[in-house]
Amino acid sequence: MNWLNALPHQIPFRAASSVIDRSEKSIRGKFLWTANETMPAQIMMVEAMAQFAGGLVFEAQGFISGIDNCEITRAIEPGDVVIVHVSVDADFGRIFRFSGTASIDGVEVARGRFYLASSDAQT
């Protein structure tokens, strides 16, 4: 099953649009920021990282349980294609720690560390 289709998020809160590449411990994908979005772009960059991270480690749904050291250095403009890269830093059973970056045209515009928790006993 395509995990992107299994995400419970719908437009305008669905940030993950396509996977560029994926390994066991990291994933890189993208989302397109449009002028019609209702959510602030800064929130969506962090949300995109979390959505891709969830697809990397969970078969069932998970949720953001913490955000650390998140830094956004540039705003997203309508039409920007944001490339997201997320890696698993630690596995604590039902909680995972990730590091993520977001870039536009090869320039990093956001980075952060965050935690996702499984909403199911199976991950």
PLM region spans:
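Hydrophobic alpha-helical segments with strong N-terminal bias
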Residues: 2, 8, 52-53, 58
